[in-house]
Every structure is written in structure tokens, then in C-alpha cells.
């Protein structure tokens, strides 16, 4: 029997001898992703910082012009033309998460000023 003083040292030596000295990985292994990375065309982007808008990677904080009087966030909103008669009305609508959002079915976020259209 091993004296109590040597027991921790004995366990440590056994562990060092039994454990491999380097990490063993299966042949042909590479990092695995838990889910597919989002793509914009052929480029991968980080959805926590960016989105894909018209096949371009855009920062979440970037804004764009929606008609002359309005701005909108392309990562979160749609710029929709709502034209009737002689006016060009622009409406900013919310993108619905998890759905391919379209102007006719999305809820309105804000309405932009009208501008007369001259022939």
C-alpha cells in the first residue's frame, strides 16, 4: 500500500503517463459550424454587425435615402413606392424577421412626404 503522503504524487504521475501529450483530431477535420453562415452572393457576413441588401453587405447602422425626404435602415426596413395619380408617395415599411418581406404585405413604419410628378 502507498503511504498517504505519496498518494497525490502517484495519481499525478499516472495521469501524466496515461494522457496524450498532443490533441488528437480525426483525419480531414476542420472547424465545424453549428449552422450555415449567412451569405450575400458568394461572400459570408456577420449577421450581428451586417446584413445583405441588394447583393451588397451593409452595416446594421447604415441608412439609405427613401425618396427625397426620407431615410431608412435597409437592414430593418423597406423603402416602398406608393404612387397614386400625380404624386410619388414613399412609405417606409418594417421587414418581418424570418420572412422574405415585401412591400405589399409588410407593416408601415413611417410615411414620407409627397412630391408632385410633372409630365
UniProtKB/Swiss-Prot annotation:
Detected in cerebellum, heart, placenta, spleen, stomach, testis and thymus. Residues 1-25 form the signal peptide. The keyword Signal applies. One of its GO terms (cellular component) is extracellular space. One of its GO terms (molecular function) is signaling receptor binding. It comes from the Eukaryota. Its main location: secreted. It is found in: Secreted. Keywords: Secreted, Signal. Belongs to the IGFL family. Potential ligand of the IGFLR1 cell membrane receptor. This is Insulin growth factor-like family member 2.
